[in-house]
Curated annotation (Swiss-Prot):
This is Orotidine 5'-phosphate decarboxylase. InterPro entries: Aldolase_TIM, OMPdecase, OMPdecase_arc, OMPdecase_AS, OMPdeCOase_dom, RibuloseP-bd_barrel. The lineage of its organism: Archaea, Methanobacteriati, Thermoplasmatota, Thermoplasmata, Thermoplasmatales. Pfam families: OMPdecase (PF00215). It comes from Thermoplasma volcanium (strain ATCC 51530 / DSM 4299 / JCM 9571 / NBRC 15438 / GSS1). The keyword Magnesium does not apply. It comes from the Archaea. The gene is pyrF. Coiled coil: none annotated.
Amino acid sequence: MDKRIIVALDVKEKKKAIDIAESLSDIVFAFKINWPLVLYSSPEVIGEISQYGKVICDFKVADIPYTNSLITERVRDLGAWGIISHSFLGEESLKSVVNAAKGMHVFSVVAMSHPGSDMINSNAMQLMKLSIECGVYGFVAPANKIDDLRMIRSATDRVIISPGIGAQGGDPYTAVLNGSDYLIVGRSVYESDKPELEVSKLQQTAERAIEDRERLKNS
């Protein structure tokens, strides 16, 4: 069974991030890093983490096309496997990310997991249509807002990665059953006394949900 867990390294200490990545390298699908880790260390941390697995840079790129291109090119050159971009800025801005990626996987945010995200989430279908036209690899959709997740899954067969598990209240089984392909989990893993065990439990839950999802689809 494919690995289904993406660990969010939402820490600011480079050594801690690298230690976590090294310990989990064999059992996760990818590592997601955000601006705090880069700003507190250096951009080169992208390449350092990528020695232990795929790195998705959650930079939620959201600027004019030229600036987006510069950000994406640098992330690609540093060795990232994927990058997350906002889609609400429109076609030209999102296309600039896709074009600059040149093989790096682009994930488009079409719905978010935090309170107050209704302005974006209510436009999820329009943002998804735009993102598909721009050629993104996959989508970011919330594990803790099942109606939004289910709606997005019903309209696409592209990859969906989902934050909102654990601290934000999302249930891993329910999220995968309703369309998530990969679960993004942070604090509940790296703050655990046994992070490897936590990832293994989440992986088993995801596998069970995938099996049930396929069974329901074929029934």
